Design a protein with these regions (language model features):
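Signature of uroporphyrinogen-III synthase
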Residues: 1-206
Length: 206
């Protein structure tokens, strides 16, 4: 596309080693592939239907041996699909991160389903942006910044301000995967659909 990528991770993903409770469960839920990657004892869980948020989550799940059968770009869009598949009350195992939006579990519990949440990973915030990113930001050399989640956008904005780059933060083009991811930013363009393909389309069309 004619762009040079500059990486500055703002989150470090680490496993929690959480134990998986005994079922039975009707299906497994995942809003991030990390929930599956850090599942300490997947065992027979892979034989259960997997309901996932995001096409990428579903793709990685298949590569890991899971059986994704329902997926949507956002939790709110996944909820009606789950409601249409399962009679109440169904039992779900949600492999999740410690920092997450509660839309999925809240919506399922409100409908009378049982949701067991196992936090298999956590995302620790970085304490500073990468030196190369700070230098490029200060010099106005960043054409666009891509944001995949609300939390990572919040941390990026905070670290830029902490480095005295508030003005530069407001001048670059922010491209966000979703409206939620865009909310911490001074201004941002939002992908037509919440997936990487449409986010990169924003970059190509800017």
């Amino acid at each position: 596309m004619g762009f040079t990528p500059l990486l500055s991770p703002v989150l470090e993903i680490v496993g929690t080693g959480a134990e998986i409770p005994r079922g039975p469960f009707d299906a497994v839920l995942a809003t991030s592939a990390k929930g599956l990657e850090f599942c300490a004892e997947p065992g027979g869980l892979r034989t259960l239907p997997l309901h996932a948020v995001g096409a990428r989550t579903a793709q990685i799940a298949r590569e890991l041996g899971w059986r994704p059968d329902l997926f949507a770009g956002e939790a709110r869009a996944l909820l009606p699909l789950i409601h249409g598949r399962h009679e109440t009350p169904a039992r779900f195992l949600y492999l999740a991160g410690r920092d997450r939006q509660s839309d999925l579990e809240t919506g399922l519990r409100a409908a009378g389903h049982d949701v067991t949440i196992v936090e298999t990973y956590e995302a620790r915030a970085a304490t500073a942006l990468a030196p190369a990113a700070l230098e490029a930001l200060a010099k106005g050399e960043i054409a666009a910044a891509l944001h995949y989640s609300r939390r990572s956008a919040e941390i990026f904005a905070k670290l830029a301000r902490d480095a005295g780059l508030t003005k530069a933060l407001g001048e670059i083009n922010h491209l966000a995967l979703s409206r939620d991811a865009a909310s911490p930013l001074p201004r941002a363009s939002i992908a037509e659909r919440p997936d990487e393909e449409h986010l990169l389309r924003l970059l190509r069309n800017r």
